[in-house]
């Protein structure tokens, strides 16, 4: 398997909209691969960003023969909702279930759906699988927010504020220079009008509670999963991923830490991202081949 970095050219994408829970969600579909698609990849982005930031992931997936779709979470990107907001306790799981169902219904019989979630999107995706809200054929988690790395004071605030002011939004305080070693990506994010640094109290509570709950479900995990995380992550605690990996059955979950990488492993500098994409491609080849074997 060649350890080539993601292509530098950006594939074209188109935007459509759907209604979920009375609000509008933006769906992004990238250009279809040449020939018959091998599967559909559904991407769930992280906190404060949007699906349009996943061109570096979409490009190689298309090259490998996959259709790629993303969507903007509630309160993010081109979707409705206050930036960083969360209007109901189940908003993100409900919306993912809606997009997942819509996507599955579009696919030809037998075509696998692979769910890829990064950071907060990794938390949403894994929590949805743990709660059996969605049942993808396979799951990829990139630096998932399974441990928010909160200090005791932050935990106290999160336990109190959502009961009093659930819609109060505050700054996340993200240090964007620690997103990736690729300075062009950092600057693009810093100047992106669709990105934000806001988080509501209700969303913060979901972030704090859903991670440990998902990790507790790891021993009974059944969905084929690739878990990759950055060892030099300052956005989420790597301990959440390592805890999940230690509890999950090794026959179902393949885990790999990349010690030198920052948070956005798919957006890392080409030389750092190359082994990430090589790992992803090799795992997809094995997983898709296994899913095509007769029962």
Regions found by a protein language model. Name each.
Residues 118-200:
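Alpha/beta-hydrolase-fold enzymes
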Residues 221, 227-229, 233:
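Short beta-strand/loop motif that positions the catalytic acidic residue
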Residues 48-51, 77-107, 274:
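Catalytic nucleophile-loop/oxyanion-hole region of alpha/beta-hydrolase
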Residues 58-82:
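Conserved alpha/beta-hydrolase
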Residues 254-295:
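Catalytic active-site module of serine/aspartate enzymes centered on a nucleophile-bearing elbow/loop
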Residues 107-118:
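Alpha/beta-hydrolase fold nucleophile elbow
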Residues 2-32:
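N-terminal cap/lid segment of alpha/beta-hydrolase-fold proteins
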Residues 223, 237-246:
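Short alpha-helix in the alpha/beta-hydrolase fold that links the catalytic acid
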């Amino acid at each position: 398997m060649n350890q080539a970095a993601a292509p530098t050219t950006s594939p074209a994408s188109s935007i459509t909209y759907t209604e979920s829970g009375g609000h509008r969600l933006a769906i992004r579909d990238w250009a279809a691969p040449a020939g018959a698609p091998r599967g559909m990849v559904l991407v769930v982005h992280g906190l404060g960003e949007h699906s349009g930031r996943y061109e570096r992931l979409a490009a190689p997936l298309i090259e490998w023969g996959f259709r790629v779709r993303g969507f903007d979470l509630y309160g993010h990107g081109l979707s409705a909702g206050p930036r960083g907001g969360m209007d109901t306790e189940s908003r993100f799981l409900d919306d993912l279930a809606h997009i997942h169902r819509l996507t599955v219904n579009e696919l030809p019989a037998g075509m696998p759906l692979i769910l890829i979630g990064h950071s907060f999107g990794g938390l949403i995706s894994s929590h949805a699988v743990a709660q059996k809200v969605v049942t993808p054929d396979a799951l990829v988690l990139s630096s998932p927010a399974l441990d928010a790395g909160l200090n005791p004071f932050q935990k106290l605030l999160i336990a109190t504020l959502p009961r009093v002011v659930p819609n109060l939004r505050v700054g996340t305080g993200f240090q964007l220079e620690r997103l990736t070693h690729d300075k062009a990506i950092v600057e693009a994010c810093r100047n992106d009008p669709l990105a934000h640094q806001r988080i509501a109290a209700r969303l913060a509570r979901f972030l704090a509670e859903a991670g440990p709950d998902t990790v507790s479900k790891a021993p009974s995990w059944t969905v084929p999963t690739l878990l990759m995380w950055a060892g030099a992550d300052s956005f989420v605690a790597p301990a959440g991923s390592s805890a999940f990996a230690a509890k999950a059955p090794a026959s179902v979950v393949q885990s790999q830490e990349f010690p030198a990488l920052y948070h956005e492993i798919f957006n890392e500098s080409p030389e750092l991202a190359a082994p990430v994409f090589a790992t992803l491609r090799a795992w997809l080849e094995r997983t898709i081949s296994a899913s095509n074997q007769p029962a």
